[in-house]
């Protein structure tokens, strides 16, 4: 009995240490992508100072979006009721980790840095993910659908306003947009419930605030 209890304690401690390391890598470090960056298909052309600052602001927003996606997904995983949903969320989270790494790489190429508020963005999204998960799996999937649809929309806008010569950032966002749409479709087909308009409105308002802040800070 004592040995079993000790094993369980070690198991919980190991899980806590692994989770702490993962959060640190996401928020403060540089997660390693499992796939090469789509940007590698294009040369890293020199941009004008104005275009470079604008591209960096947009890519910082997208980097924050991926920080938020990590928080949302892992908050949901923590309280997911079904193993199938956990697998779905973890698979999507891995693709989001690739996105995060690609955006981080591009930010440094643009001689910029991630948002200083990343711990805040991650914490808020993690809490939202736990809240969504506690509502039940269909509602949790509904948050995935709405989040990914909003991300897809702002990626489309960024594709239109990126500097014309920034092919590397554009290709990253193009691939991300395709994969975000797929995440939304998969969650929808898995039984997502449509979120009430007050919730989707609040999410859109929070996203607008994030974009204003992250573009500069």
Curated annotation (Swiss-Prot):
Top-level class of the enzyme under EC nomenclature: oxidoreductase
Chief location: membrane
Record function comment: Catalyzes the hydroxylation of 2-nonaprenyl-3-methyl-6-methoxy-1,4-benzoquinol during ubiquinone biosynthesis.
MF (Gene Ontology): 3-demethoxyubiquinol 3-hydroxylase activity; metal ion binding
Organism field: Xylella fastidiosa (strain Temecula1 / ATCC 700964)
Location of the protein in the cell: Cell membrane
Alphabetized Gene3D superfamilies for the sequence: 1.20.1260.10
Pathway assigned in UniProt: Cofactor biosynthesis; ubiquinone biosynthesis
Name this protein carries in UniProt: 3-demethoxyubiquinol 3-hydroxylase
Family indicated by similarity: Belongs to the COQ7 family.
Cofactor(s) recorded in Swiss-Prot or TrEMBL: Fe cation
CC cofactor note: Binds 2 iron ions per subunit.
Reaction equations catalysed: a 5-methoxy-2-methyl-3-(all-trans-polyprenyl)benzene-1,4-diol + AH2 + O2 = a 3-demethylubiquinol + A + H2O
Residues reported in the UniProt entry to bind Fe cation 2: 96, 148, 180, 183
Originating gene: coq7
InterPro entries: COQ7_proteobact, Ferritin-like, Ferritin-like_SF, Ubq_synth_Coq7
Keywords: Cell membrane, Iron, Membrane, Metal-binding, Monooxygenase, Oxidoreductase, Ubiquinone biosynthesis
Biological process according to GO: ubiquinone biosynthetic process
EC number, as in UniProt: 1.14.99.60
A cellular component annotation (GO) from this entry: plasma membrane
Residues annotated as binding Fe cation 1: 66, 96, 99, 180
UniProt membrane topology term: Peripheral membrane protein
């Amino acid at each position: 009995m004592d040995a079993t209890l000790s094993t369980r304690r070690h198991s919980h401690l190991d899980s806590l240490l692994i989770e702490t390391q993962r959060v640190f890598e996401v928020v403060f470090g540089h997660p390693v992508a499992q796939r090469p960056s789509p940007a590698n298909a294009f040369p890293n052309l020199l941009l004008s100072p104005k275009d470079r600052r604008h591209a960096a602001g947009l890519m910082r927003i997208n980097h924050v979006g991926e920080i938020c996606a990590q928080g949302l997904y892992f908050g949901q995983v923590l309280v997911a009721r079904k193993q199938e949903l956990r697998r779905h969320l973890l698979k999507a989270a891995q693709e989001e980790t690739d996105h995060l790494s690609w955006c981080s790489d591009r930010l440094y190429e643009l001689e910029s840095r991630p948002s200083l508020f990343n711990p805040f963005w991650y914490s808020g999204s993690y809490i939202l993910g736990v809240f969504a998960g506690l509502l039940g799996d269909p509602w949790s999937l509904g948050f995935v659908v709405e989040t990914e649809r909003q991300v897809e929309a702002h990626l489309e806008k960024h594709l239109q306003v990126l500097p014309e010569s920034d092919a590397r950032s554009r290709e990253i966002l193009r691939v991300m947009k395709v994969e975000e749409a797929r995440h939304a479709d998969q969650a929808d087909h898995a039984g997502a419930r449509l979120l009430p308009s007050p919730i989707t409105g609040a999410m859109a308002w929070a996203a607008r605030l994030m974009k204003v802040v992250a573009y500069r800070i």
